[in-house]
Amino acid sequence: MPELPEVEVTRRGIEPFVAGRRVERVDVRTAMLRWPVPAGLAEQLRAREVLAVERRGKYLLFEVDAGWFIVHLGMTGTLRVLPAAGVPVAAKHDHIDWIFDEFVLRFRDPRRFGAVLWHPREAGDVHAHPLLASLGVEPFSPAFTGALLHARTRGRTVSVKQALLAGDMVVGVGNIYASESLFRAGIRPTTAAGKVSLPRYERLADAVRATLADAIERGGSTLRDFVGSNGESGYFQLDCFVYDRAGQPCRVCGTPIRQIVQGQRSTYYCPTCQR
């Protein structure tokens, strides 16, 4: 599933093409994704100029004067920028095209767990949308600190890894990045969130920011489907310290990496480096 780094890589790849450009038309070939595509989306966006492209968590927010269209990539979704001249014929899983003067922005999603939604300006700020309002803080914002994590986890018995994945404290720390961040911070993923000290949470906040920044720099992680807007795969998975390295020696101490299951997801850690 595309997580924050993959969505941010997509945003950075798309924004230079669409910001300041007008949508000539929208071709909706699949009316039902995770939720129904708004029936009037094509008409709402016709001849509208894209003012900005923002990311909130794993959602992409495309602002036009009348509102925002919101895109979530789901499990297998991608957004590609394709030249209008000679654009490939839409394949089975190519659900929506936004046609601009010189290129096409194409949404592809084999499993159809992604979403394309519309938030009109008269409904208020897009960040008040029901899907966005309850999200945690952005990991690169000043609000994301070890003190925040420490305060929000007092008395919680859930594991620190599952607390990170929940998304109500901080957004975008998916399974890969939770395992990697906890390794960098030296925290065992099974530790109860409420028992992690403030200094260790301060290290964890720094580790989350560093891990996500490194992943964005490497184009995200491509484990199966993800490609950026230019069709290129990400390479962060090649740099992982622990994720998907069960039985292999720790890159720091040489101890074999262990794999366990937490909340039906695989977790990887070093039993020596992480306490």
Swiss-Prot record:
Active site: P2, E3, K58, R265
Reactions performed catalytically: Hydrolysis of DNA containing ring-opened 7-methylguanine residues, releasing 2,6-diamino-4-hydroxy-5-(N-methyl)formamidopyrimidine; 2'-deoxyribonucleotide-(2'-deoxyribose 5'-phosphate)-2'-deoxyribonucleotide-DNA = a 3'-end 2'-deoxyribonucleotide-(2,3-dehydro-2,3-deoxyribose 5'-phosphate)-DNA + a 5'-end 5'-phospho-2'-deoxyribonucleoside-DNA + H(+)
Sorted UniProt keywords: DNA damage, DNA repair, DNA-binding, Glycosidase, Hydrolase, Lyase, Metal-binding, Multifunctional enzyme, Zinc, Zinc-finger
EC number(s) on file: 3.2.2.23, 4.2.99.18
Chain residues that bind DNA: H93, R111, R156
Zinc finger (FPG-type): 241-275
Cofactor(s) required for function per UniProt: Zn(2+)
Bound cofactor: record note: Binds 1 zinc ion per subunit.
Pfam families named in the record: Fapy_DNA_glyco (PF01149), H2TH (PF06831), zf-FPG_IleRS (PF06827)
Cystine pairs: none
The family this protein is said to belong to: Belongs to the FPG family.
Record's subunit section: Monomer.
Function: Involved in base excision repair of DNA damaged by oxidation or by mutagenic agents. Acts as a DNA glycosylase that recognizes and removes damaged bases. Has a preference for oxidized purines, such as 7,8-dihydro-8-oxoguanine (8-oxoG). Has AP (apurinic/apyrimidinic) lyase activity and introduces nicks in the DNA strand. Cleaves the DNA backbone by beta-delta elimination to generate a single-strand break at the site of the removed base with both 3'- and 5'-phosphates.
Protein name: Formamidopyrimidine-DNA glycosylase
Gene: mutM
